[in-house]
């Protein structure tokens, strides 16, 4: 089958790029002929809330075949659609996650479909985490003419059917986010001790990790609020919270939360974008990952943890309870509750849950394969559904 991917590609970085690169690798291994239509620009510098949109990506990631799309340039939309039509794909697979991209995506869809290709969306979320002007109409413009969808959680499916009237549920396939393995192909994994040594982390401390972009909806201030309870339980040497990620937007709430917590001896704050080839060390060095989200539809961070047999402590919001089995692969807690976060982390360590939960995660991981996603898209590409 001839398949085109449409979405950001190297040298852009971030979870969307990594997702599409791993999907590209899987589809290529399954024998499909591929074309990746990438982005020329992603966000205007004036409104980009992070520190860097481009940079080093993993060496195995393919470069895009074309890179013309700019979200605010209608001429680029036309050229992108023409590139896609010239490839003559059986289907175009696009990632959708933010209304900012909707005008361009909807326009490319309408022009590219003139060549007979089916248009498929893989949906991270339909309802944006942050408030966005005209989000509903923009999302309906982008998604309303698509031929099929992959919803990565029940929450995403429900949001799609509520937001875009007329979508036939039979055209919506359910497939959870696959696991993210950031290891370099052919390179052995480090041990926990080796990963900690490489990162300069204490060899014997209990280590919890928050990983990913630091945005308001991810609840990092509540996680910082849990630190006094963890310090009281384990002292200055027995526990470490490692926070790795780029702050999106105003950093003042995090600075204030750190001052209020007054727990710098047990906090390792590593601000900035983490290159893909450094992700593995951070996850291997940790005992568990923590997702203190205030809201969510799904999260690739759970799948990062699962790729390395690491349990999670997560808030019970959105689609997260669909992938975190409470008491088996991790613990679920209420959102916006620092004490509940602390109690779950303490329970994990004091009850010695790491080994049993790690085994449960390893068994659960089989559900979240890239081949499962590829098979789902293959069915949609030829007109099938769930």
Give the location of each predicted region:
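Acidic donor-binding loop of glycosyltransferase active sites
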Residues: 281-297, 307-310
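Glycosyltransferase donor-sugar binding loop
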Residues: 39-43, 240-255, 272
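A short, well-ordered alpha-helix in the C-terminal region of glycosyltransferases
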Residues: 194-197, 353-367
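Nucleotide-activated donor-binding/catalytic signature segment of Leloir-type glycosyltransferases, i.e.
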Residues: 254-281
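Conserved acidic donor-binding segment of nucleotide-sugar-dependent glycosyltransferases
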Residues: 326-327, 331-338, 346-352
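Donor nucleotide-sugar binding/catalytic pocket of nucleotide-sugar-dependent glycosyltransferases
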Residues: 144-187
